[in-house]
């Protein structure tokens, strides 16, 4: 349930909802990447450094989830039911209705329930979600939206990490994909509450001001267990990775009772429009934002030693629950971020456009033991040349500013990552944007990048210490094609190739694929227009990680592989449709965590969904 996404060799840690960012720490699993997509109209992905948009963030990408709004002036909606592998059942209702006779005030509610087991032993997940929003036209030029979102996710027997990868002799283990280290008593529960508001004011025909505001609270409570060890092939006994540091570090895993809350208050006010200068039309956008994010987490930990588990060959989840000590404060910090930003698109000539922008960010974090404050100005410059009505080329530059949550051997947080992002590209647009293509070449330069020392922070519960490294470079090329090839044929195709190295020429994050190819297509049969068939292929190249162990340097490796998915949809009546999906058609066994433990991806699975629209 700890879903992480990557782009251009780095983790995506900027998640936005309606343009308002939330920065999250991957070590605390608050479900940021698991929000139910039924609540959103679409998901936008902007690749590369996005400091002009968000103020901070990895030079990977930013994900913006756009909420559904009440757009209909008459009652309409849809309901769906889905059933699938591992006892999956899912029900969703999406309803819109006018609240006034003229439709100027409208409401939309989306609600759903999902329950499913897993290919993993003992696992079960139950999810409830709801969103309600009211959109009101206060006049010809003014619109107000206000809403509330709720999600509850309860998971029983979730895994925390994976299965021990190596034996003490350096050989690799393999397991049944159902094997899990989660005990019967483990759980991970999350509750999300958000209120939000948007006010839009148009001025004449060319200018608009937008105010976005949100307050969110995410709470979680979990008791889980992890195993981090090597297996003695002779008897299945586990050996800890830090045993050479002395008896106190001879643990082979641990249990954790973690609870906490993250609160975010954020405002974003901006205006955008066009202006005339030197006889040409240009565009301008400017604004300011403020966010306050408080993270408070408490925990209770216990180390697990080899005799407590016994032979791992016999482990089946019946590990006794820890006699928990009272929870103590693990983290309490508040991050304030204030930004002012502006950007303009200047038409230098009919085919040539200059884009200039900057964002000033004041970032401050206050913890229990110290405070850190940084001021940073993120410049952006781009040049777009329209070759003809269909083709254009561009070049862009921006800087990188990324606060970090990794700590050094003294326990202090590392200074923010800084750097530069360069990009060249070629775009095409056909049939009024029904079909688009993009080819991009990028180069990312970073300093202060966290690199693991492989040793724990003294006095911590085994938390790994990191050091800051300068001179990290990622460079590569991306290609995308999206849209309608014909009236009946839709195609999405993307390919990426990059390399990422540190200042000594060593690979950075070699556990992430350097080459990927993704394709998804659908085709509506002309002879039977009620029937649509399609599928997709995701391919990635070989990945690896070298890990220094007490027994030498071991390499974890996953060869290149492709996953194939299929679907078919049949429009039974004007209002009712059925869709069947098959994921991992060829039942490929693959490892999603090419590090010290093994985490298998989902085996072949099926689902069928019925949708009724009215």
Give a label for each model feature.
Residues 200-202, 208-214, 218-224, 393, ...:
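Membrane-embedded beta-barrel scaffold of Gram-negative outer-membrane proteins
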Residues 445, 539-548, 566-614:
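C-terminal beta-signal and adjacent terminal beta-strands/loops
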Residues 114-118, 131-202, 217-262, 307-333, ...:
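Acidic/polar loop-and-plug regions of large Gram-negative outer-membrane beta-barrel proteins
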Residues 195-218, 251-368:
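Face-selective signature of the C-terminal outer-membrane beta-barrel domain
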Residues 349-351, 467-548, 586-589, 609-613:
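Gram-negative outer-membrane beta-barrel transporters
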Residues 23-24, 39-41, 47, 52-132, ...:
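Outer-membrane beta-barrel translocator/receptor signature
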Residues 135-137, 262-264, 280-293, 329-446, ...:
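Structural signature of Gram-negative outer-membrane beta-barrels, strongest in the C-terminal barrel
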Residues 4-49:
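Periplasmic plug
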